Amino acid sequence: MNTRFSNVYDDHARSEAYATLEFPGTYYLAFRDLPAIIGEHVHGRKAVDFGCGAGRSTQFLRELGFEVVGVDISEPMLARARARDPQGDYRLVPDGELGSLAANAYDLALSAFTFDNIPTMEKKVTLLQGLKRLLTAGGQIVNLVSSPEIYVNEWASFSTRDFPENRAARCGDKVLIVMLDVEDRRPVEDILWTDEGYREVYERAGVRPIRTYRPLGNPGEPYSWVSEAGLAPWVIYVLGRAE
């Protein structure tokens, strides 16, 4: 089995579409609560953005006051990040290899949606161990991932109605979803991963969940929620060293 960490956004057309996306609709819920979550759990100002893509989350962290390095496996996405943010620090990490970054140097490692595309338990564990190596003694990992519910419901920014096979998917299976906020409507292929599966990954990687958040849409927000008011499309794990 090929277990290399690949990225659908190496595709030129898809990376072009994704690079124009900000934080609308369902994506708003992924980032709405992060300032408060990070403020509660993270002490220090150095951060690494793992899977930074076009750099939106990297700039988000900088706006929160962090000195941040954005890393990604996709050169096309990094090129867009550098074009959008010429002053940013963006680095290529082939296959997610983080050995070029200093150990024990970062107070926060943010991973926003990256683990949705990592194919196996072993690869997830290895990458989390790599992120753990980067942390200061009191550093935290914030792992933002798609909930299993996102692949079997309709959302302001996503559709899964054309993929009934998603309902039979188990932890580690491929699932399909369409992004509605970009011109490129080809299905995105993700890897379904359950809460139970993530907790096993964390135990094997030597990190422990400190808090888990499942953000819901609220009345009065500037979006027409579909499932978001009752079902969380995202799960946000705050992780620390297990020692």
Describe these PLM feature segments.
Residues M1-V42, R56, F60:
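Conserved class I S-adenosyl-L-methionine
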Residues G44-K46:
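Nucleotide donor/acceptor-binding cores
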Residues V48-F50, A54-G99:
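Class I SAM-dependent methyltransferase SAM/SAH-binding core
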Residues S100-A109:
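A short acidic, Gly/Pro-enriched loop at the edge of an enzyme's catalytic core
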Residues V125-A137:
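A short glycine-rich, Lys/Arg-flanked "PGG" loop and its adjoining helix->strand segment in the class I
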Residues V142-V201:
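SAM-dependent methyltransferase
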